Structure formats: structure tokens, C-alpha cells
Regions:
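Short, solvent-exposed loop/helix junctions and linker helices
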Residues: 5, 78-84, 210, 227
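Active-site diphosphate/adenylate-binding microenvironment
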Residues: 60-142
């Protein structure tokens, strides 16, 4: 829109530039969180009616449409495994006592569409900057802070390579964290733009191997599972948690070279 009733800016040095990009009836300069807290309190104090049901219902309808469009992938028996089928199987194993951590690019984008975490504060990921490698550090802290909960990491194979050896730390401290690697043998989010711009003969440092990361974790003293068929996923995850050890489930998934299938970022 060309005009908005209200916007909030996070930095005071933009005071003189209010309205440069977007016209406003009222510009507020200050901390975004504090501003919204004050506005919320003002709405309550003035008893202003707020009804977001129409907007919420529109979002729910769009979400359902996207879920229906992805259903064939989520039910796929394809081998290598469809990434969304992997995510569906993971979702079936998520319980109320679980903290889920996403550490990857494509696989986390897919997982976030399918996995329903039980409550606020039970999902963590690299955030908007995509700082890969946070999976095991987040998991170590989460498991130590909440020893009564189960902690699950959803990894891309590339991101596992950054801090995967911290499974050694989990073994030494007896923290039964379970990781699941969506292994497509690629840095997918870098591979596709390279191929699109330069062709498949000019890919640089984006192709990986179908490495047996599960054997790495076993060598460190943990439990490993290697999965190549959709029906094997959920039983492998169950065995991983039941092992009582830090564990890794290494799942071979389809590599989408020309575009991540089902990749609507909504």
C-alpha cells in the first residue's frame, strides 16, 4: 500500500528520514518490542475492539490449500525419499514433551510446513540469516536445561558437517539428543542457482557425497540408523529415542536439482 496508518522503526538515527519509503499517519521511533507493548496496553486501556478472525481464517484457508497441494508428496513411496514424506514421518513422531530444532536450508523450509510443534518455545532454527550449524549447540543447551524433554534436530546434510562432531559432546555428557539428516548429497540452496545461471557443468563446491553420517555418530559412541525407504523412517526414529544415547538417523532423500518440489515459501 502507498500509505499505512502506523509503522515502528527500530533505530533512532532514522528519525529525520521518517516517511522516506512509506507514508505514515503516525511514525514511532524506538524499540519495536517496547512500542508494540505500549500500543497493546493502550488498546486494552481504551477498550478498542480488535477482531482478527477474518485475517486468521484467510490464513488458515491458504494454509489448507497448500497442505492439500503437497499431499501427494507427503504420501509418496518414491526412492530416494521425497523430502516432504520424510517431514511427514518426522511430524508423526513429534510429541508433547519434545523440543524440535531445525538446522539446514531446504529441509528446514520443508519441515516447517509440515511439523506441528506442541507449543510456543518448542521450535528453534537458524533464523532469517540462515546461520547454519546451530543445531547441536541449541540442542545441547535445550537438553541440559530441560532434561525431562526429548530433543530432536532436523538437519540438512550440509549443515550437519558444520557441528556434527559435537555429538561427541552429547555422548560425553550423556545427553540423548536425536538428529535426523535429510541427505540429498548437496548444498541445495546454492546448487540450484548455480545450475540455473551457469549450467550443470559449472557447479562449484555444492555437490556432496551420500556420506554415512550415522556411522560417524556410532564411532563417537552414539546410536546410528541408515534409512533408504519411506516405511523405515518412523521405526528408525523410534529406535533412536529408545536407545537412550545421542543418535542420528541418516535418511537418503531425493535431490531436487532444478527446483525444490513443493517449495512455496508460505
Amino acid at each position: 500500500p502507498r500509505s499505512t496508518p502506523l509503522y515502528s522503526s527500530a533505530a533512532s538515527d532514522v528519525y529525520k528520514r521518517q516517511g522516506d519509503n512509506r507514508a505514515a499517519d503516525l511514525g514511532l521511533v524506538g524499540n519495536i518490542g517496547m512500542n508494540f507493548q505500549l500500543m497493546t496496553q493502550e488498546i486494552e486501556d481504551r477498550d478498542v475492539p480488535v477482531d482478527v478472525s477474518r485475517y486468521r481464517d484467510q490464513l488458515r484457508e491458504r494454509e489448507q490449500q497448500l497442505d492439500n497441494a503437497r499431499r501427494d508428496q507427503m504420501d509418496s513411496e518414491e526412492v530416494p525419499i521425497d523430502p516432504l514424506r520424510l517431514c511427514r514421518e518426522i511430524a508423526s513422531c513429534v510429541s508433547d514433551d519434545m523440543i524440535v530444532i531445525g538446522d539446514g536450508g531446504d529441509i528446514v523450509a520443508q519441515a516447517s510446513k509440515v511439523i506441528q510443534v506442541p507449543r510456543n518455545g518448542t521450535w528453534m532454527d537458524p533464523g532469517p540469516l540462515g546461520t547454519l550449524g546451530v543445531g547441536m549447540p541449541f540442542a545441547l543447551a535445550a537438553q541440559k536445561a530441560h532434561p525431562d524433554k526429548r530433543v530432536l534436530i532436523v538437519y540438512g546434510d550440509g549443515s550437519f558437517g558444520l557441528n556434527g562432531f559435537e555429538f561427541d559432546t552429547a555422548v560425553r555428557f550423556g545427553l540423548p539428543i536425536v538428529g535426523i539428516v535429510g541427505n540429498d548429497a548437496a548444498w541445495g540452496q546454492m546448487m540450484r542457482p548455480q545450475e540455473m545461471l551457469y549450467g550443470e557443468d559449472r557447479l562449484v563446491a555444492v555437490e556432496l557425497n551420500r556420506t554415512r553420517y550415522d556411522l560417524v555418530v556410532e564411532a563417537l559412541g552414539g546410536h546410528g540408523e541408515h534409512v533408504v525407504a519411506p516405511g523405515e523412517i518412523a521405526p528408525a526414529i523410534t529406535r533412536a529415542f529408545e536407545s537412550g544415547k545421542p543418535a542420528l538417523v541418516n535418511v537418503e532423500i531425493r535431490q531436487d536439482r532444478t527446483g525444490m518440489k513443493g517449495s512455496t515459501y508460505v
